[in-house]
Amino acid sequence: MFLLYEYDLFWAFLIISSLIPILAFFISGVLAPISKGPEKLSTYESGIEPMGDAWLQFRIRYYMFALVFVVFDVETVFLYPWAMSFDVLGVSVFIEAFIFVLILIGGLVYAWRKGALEWS
């Protein structure tokens, strides 16, 4: 039998943790002074008067490097618990981690061959 009352603590935590940021944004929006002027509309650059246009276009290469970094950063997050529990879980976990690493290496080779890692 599936008992829903066992999840009451979870739902209470979910509701409270959702309401706190919503209330914080609402209260700051109500209590914050609203003053619009040329100083508020200008770009802030370390207290120095801005020179030129504040809009700057980034090259797509930065995005590709960031994406590859995030993929391998997440890989590290997944591999660390596997490495710490290897002696308890055994060979099956090693095989799963090996397959996971092979898939990521395949993705890295694909990105390399497509030229995503070339800096030109």
Swiss-Prot record:
Main location: plastid
Transmembrane spans: 10-30, 64-84, 88-108
MF (Gene Ontology): NADH dehydrogenase (ubiquinone) activity; quinone binding
Pfam families associated with the record: Oxidored_q4 (PF00507)
Keyword terms of this UniProt record: Chloroplast, Membrane, NAD, NADP, Plastid, Plastoquinone, Quinone, Thylakoid, Translocase, Transmembrane, Transmembrane helix, Transport
Enzyme nomenclature, EC number: 7.1.1.-
Top-rank EC class of the record's enzyme: translocase
Catalytic activity: a plastoquinone + NADH + (n+1) H(+)(in) = a plastoquinol + NAD(+) + n H(+)(out); a plastoquinone + NADPH + (n+1) H(+)(in) = a plastoquinol + NADP(+) + n H(+)(out)
Compartment(s): Plastid, Chloroplast thylakoid membrane
Disulfide bonds: none
Membrane topology of this protein: Multi-pass membrane protein
Keyword Lipoprotein among UniProt keywords: no
GO cellular component, one term: NADH dehydrogenase complex
GO biological process terms, semicolon-separated: photosynthesis, light reaction
Family: Belongs to the complex I subunit 3 family.
Oligomer status and interactors: NDH is composed of at least 16 different subunits, 5 of which are encoded in the nucleus.
PANTHER family attached to this UniProt entry: NADH-UBIQUINONE OXIDOREDUCTASE CHAIN 3
Chain's role: NDH shuttles electrons from NAD(P)H:plastoquinone, via FMN and iron-sulfur (Fe-S) centers, to quinones in the photosynthetic chain and possibly in a chloroplast respiratory chain. The immediate electron acceptor for the enzyme in this species is believed to be plastoquinone. Couples the redox reaction to proton translocation, and thus conserves the redox energy in a proton gradient.
Name recorded for this polypeptide: NAD(P)H-quinone oxidoreductase subunit 3, chloroplastic
Record lineage: Eukaryota, Viridiplantae, Streptophyta, Embryophyta, Tracheophyta
